[in-house]
Swiss-Prot record:
Transmembrane segments annotated in the record for this chain: 12-32, 54-74, 97-117, 139-159, 170-190, 216-236, 249-269, 295-315, 344-364, 375-395, 400-420, 428-448
PANTHER family hit by this protein: K+ POTASSIUM TRANSPORTER, OSMOTIC STRESS POTASSIUM TRANSPORTER
Keyword Ligase among record annotations: no
GO MF term list: potassium ion transmembrane transporter activity; symporter activity
Entry superkingdom: Bacteria
Protein name, per record: Probable potassium transport system protein Kup 1
Membrane topology category: Multi-pass membrane protein
Summary of the function given for this chain in its UniProt record: Transport of potassium into the cell. Likely operates as a K(+):H(+) symporter.
CC terms in the record's Gene Ontology section: plasma membrane
Catalytic activity from the UniProt record: K(+)(in) + H(+)(in) = K(+)(out) + H(+)(out)
Similarity comment: Belongs to the HAK/KUP transporter (TC 2.A.72) family.
Length: 650
């Protein structure tokens, strides 16, 4: 999105409603259903319980979404970009251990990306079960619900490679209609008992936690927390829609959500003996809708659920790309299906989320069972975000008293919700923890495996590149050797602008002398700023040996092939390097020669001097490297002439 659309405007507000609020906007589909089910059904709840539950929902959303996210977290942006990884880049220099909450929180959010589509779409489709259409009941069993859900999810994941820029333009108007519908239907039901507004008083929320009518006790917070899942999207998507558009649109969304929860509460109070016609789990959201409008509501809810799922999938792609840039995950093949900035598609992640989401649907079978697994991982990510926000506030020199109040207040809240959600572990919560744990393990291995490798490399033989420039220049002009390439490009880490691994020069000079018109040594540096694209050049007084330091933002596409070609054009134009006129070419006036790229990868060998934990960690990292995409794709060199050379790690 361009900067103009990030300013608050009617269009910007509409776009924000379509992109940001899908997850939290579909929470009314299952929050009250989960709360009532936790009490054993509608017959086991009374007025005090319902008013207290609605109060807990409202104040949970107010504190965790409005106060912590909209008012506080949206201030902690990195050049306009938000999310847990952007927050980490702001504070990582304060302490090395801060990488742990970033890894844990990121893994938990990615795990949520597999659960949200399963829960929201299944819940929406369950509204069709038992509904009479044309004198019959087309969806008469849960098996049919599951079949329809899986079909919708398969279609959703299959269209990701085509991009969502076209259908994405409709998200805003559709979600605006959805939220308006939530508010209107809630207001209509509220008219049956305006005393439900007592729930605005937080005293009722506190009383419920200790009330004898509350059989679940404090653990009811596990169901209450579902109302605020999706709050993290307000922070992570701020770079797409702009801070002002989120701040401006949130009051409308919050009011519509509140009205709907009020309406569901009134319906429950007015129907204490109601039993669903199909004998299944009661869902107040659908039951409070007049039967004549039920089908339209289900269709709208399904579309909203798909939009919420789409937002989570797109967010997962972005999160993985950021994690790769920060060396939390292996680099993966990234496609750009649209010219729209920031829209990416990662085939391997799309397949992984698709398989995991459908497996969750098939395993749990009902949305009620899925809700048992839902929310646990997000409580963990919120606690990690609170820790990082505390460090950010300290970095900003906020009064230490207020900073500690923030940490204690929100830390205690997050821990309470996490403890209450732990009761879900045996009822399916282990699934979300397993997924988050697997992702976190991969991140840990990759990050710390790289750290150990880099530490070993620092002890290995490095040579000064500037001491070999004469030899490289002579080889470049030595016609006794065939030309290997016009431009020979090594993806090499040149430290302090002059030190390079001996193996790289060995590859050029000793292995089989590689003659080239120009030798390029390219280092890719990931910056804290999200969209940096800069470079620095050092030719060491030659026209044949060039050290390029690329500085790319952690959200920037790593297309080294494209960048290097442009740099060559620039350096030829200003006379820094020799011209490369092409006598034989299909492109008239072509002044840049061919390119050959070389990537040197480390491998574990019997000579590798590693033992115990460090050896295991580096070996695991190498296995992950082998399982991930071709190293050429890491640097955007899939279609370039690229050679992978392997050298043993000493």
């Amino acid at each position: 999105m361009n900067n103009k659309s990030k300013r608050m405007s009617a269009a910007g507000l509409l776009i924000a409603i379509g992109i940001v609020y899908g997850d939290i906007g579909t929470s009314p589909l299952y929050v009250m259903k989960s709360i009532v089910k936790a009490m054993g059904g509608i017959g086991n709840v009374n007025r005090e319980f319902i008013i207290g539950s609605i109060s807990l929902v409202l104040w949970t959303v107010t504190l965790l979404t409005t106060l912590q996210t909209v008012i506080i977290a949206l201030k902690a942006t990195n050049h306009g970009e938000g999310g847990i990884f952007a927050l980490y880049t702001l504070v990582r220099k304060r302490a090395k251990w801060l990488v742990l909450p970033a890894l844990i929180g990121g893994a938990a959010i990615l795990a949520d990306g597999t659960l949200t589509p399963a829960v929201t779409v299944t819940t929406a489709i369950e509204g069709l079960k038992g509904l009479q259409l044309g004198g019959g009941v087309p969806v008469s069993s849960q098996s049919m619900v599951i079949a329809i859900t899986v079909l919708i999810l398969l279609v959703l994941f299959s269209i990701q490679k085509m991009g969502t820029s076209i259908i994405g333009k409709a998200f805003g108007p559709i979600m605006f209609v959805w939220f308006t519908f939530l508010g209107v239907i809630g207001l209509i039901n509220m008219s049956g008992d305006w005393s439900i507004l007592q729930a605005i008083n937080p005293v009722y929320a506190i009383k419920l936690l200790f009330s004898p009518y509350n059989k679940a006790g404090i653990f009811i917070l596990g169901s209450i927390f579902l109302a605020t899942t999706g709050a993290e999207a307000l922070y992570s998507d701020v770079g797409h829609v702009g801070k002002k558009n989120i701040i401006g649109s949130w009051p409308f969304v919050f009011v519509c959500l509140s009205l709907n929860y009020f309406g569901q509460g009134v319906w429950i109070l007015n129907n204490p003996t109601y039993r669903p016609a199909d004998g299944g789990v009661l869902n107040p959201f659908y039951e409070m809708i007049p039967s004549d409008f039920r089908l339209a509501a289900i269709i709208l809810a399904t579309i909203a659920a798909v939009i919420a799922s789409q937002a989570l999938i797109t967010g997962s792609f972005t999160l993985v790309a950021e994690a790769s840039g920060l060396k939390f995950l292996p680099r993966m093949k990234i496609d750009y299906p649209s010219t729209e900035k920031g829209q990416i598609y990662i085939p391997s992640i799309n397949k992984g989320i698709c398989v995991a989401t459908i497996a969750i649907v098939l395993y749990f079978q009902t949305s009620a069972h899925m809700e048992a697994a839902y929310g646990l991982s997000i409580t963990i990510s919120m606690l990690m975000t609170t820790i990082l926000l505390y460090e950010w506030l300290a970095m900003k020199k906020v009064n230490p008293v207020w900073n500690w109040i923030f940490l204690i207040f929100f830390g205690v809240l997050d821990i309470m919700f996490m403890i209450s959600s732990l009761t879900k572990f045996t009822h399916g919560g282990y699934v979300s923890l397993f997924i988050a744990g697997a992702i976190g393990f991969i991140m840990y291995v990759w990050y710390y495996g790289n750290k150990i490798r880099d530490k070993r490399e620092a002890r290995n033989a490095y040579v000064r590149l500037d001491e070999y420039t004469d030899m490289l220049t002579n080889l470049s002009h030595d016609e006794n050797y065939p030309t290997y390439a016009t431009n020979l490009v090594y993806m090499a880490n040149v430290k302090y602008n002059k030190f390079i691994k001996r193996e790289i020069l060995y590859s050029i000079l000793d292995k089989r002398p590689k003659r080239a018109k120009a030798y390029w040594f390219v280092t890719v540096n990931v910056t804290n700023e999200p969209f940096t694209a800069e470079y620095a050049v050092n030719t060491y007084g030659t026209k044949n040996v060039i050290n390029i330091q690329l500085y790319l933002g952690f959200k920037k596409q790593t297309s080294v092939n494209v960048y290097i070609r442009q740099i060559v054009h620039d350096l030829i134009a200003d006379g820094t390097i020799e011209p490369q006129p092409q006598e034989y070419t299909t492109t008239p006036g072509r002044d840049v020669g061919d390119f050959s790229f070389v990537i040197v990868n480390d491998v574990i060998s019997p000579q590798t001097q590693l033992i115990g934990y460090e050896k295991w960690l580096v070996e695991a990292r190498v296995r992950l490297q082998n399982l991930s995409s071709n190293p050429a794709s890491w640097f955007g060199l899939e279609y370039a002439d690229t050679v992978i050379e392997r050298v043993p790690l000493s």
